[in-house]
Amino acid sequence: MPSNLGCSGAWNLIIKSFMKAPYWIISNHDVMYEPGFLQEMNEKAQDPETGVVHGKGGGWDIFLLKDWMVQRYGLFDENLYPGYCEDMDYGMRFIHDDVKRVLSLDHGYYHGTKKDDYSDGSQTWRSEPAIAQGVHLAHEMNKRYLHMKWSEAWQSHIEGETYKTPFDLDDMPVSFTTYDLDFVRRKHLGF
């Protein structure tokens, strides 16, 4: 197994490793939960019509994904390597459908907020200019990939202006992803 699967690859590995689970809670590594947060997330997941439970504001830094969502919309696109935009890509798959989402919970969590000695985010790439440059480049390339896949309107999530299928191909299922090794290699740049 490579040393860095990337965000999508890691999330897919979680899903594939626990195939019998009714849902998966996927969280950024630097999220801290307040007491009761995960219990509330579990309670919201009991509604069979709910497809995704977000921590707050519809964000993807901590989310619960139901098994029927993966059956209908597939796994995460591993071309979005090493990270960034994989959540937006997944959201674009069901933007034209009536998927029930819980956008915020009453219990909180911390991500990107200082609390005591907590420091958010990966400190490695922030302290290493060469790694930071590679992360920035990969982020920009991932955004361009999403422009091709969903149209330039993907960033604003405007329903009527985005493609209904990947790459605007009518016969393409929304769950379509293919692993393009050359595309990923071009972005690898030391990751």
Tell me the role of every PLM-derived stretch:
Residues 1-5:
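Conserved donor nucleotide-binding strand/loop of the catalytic core
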Residues 9, 13, 36-43, 89-93, ...:
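Alpha-helical elements of Rossmann-like donor-binding domains used by nucleotide-donor carbohydrate transfer enzymes
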Residues 12-23:
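Active-site nucleotide-sugar/metal-binding loop of Leloir-type enzymes
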Residues 21-32:
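Short beta-strand-to-loop acidic/aromatic patch adjacent to the donor-nucleotide binding site
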Residues 31-62, 68:
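Conserved donor NDP-sugar-binding/catalytic core segment of glycosyltransferases
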Residues 59, 64-65, 75-80:
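Conserved nucleotide-sugar donor-binding catalytic segment
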Residues 83-89:
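Acidic donor-binding loop at a coil-to-helix junction in glycosyltransferase catalytic cores
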Residues 91-191:
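C-terminal catalytic/acceptor-binding lobe
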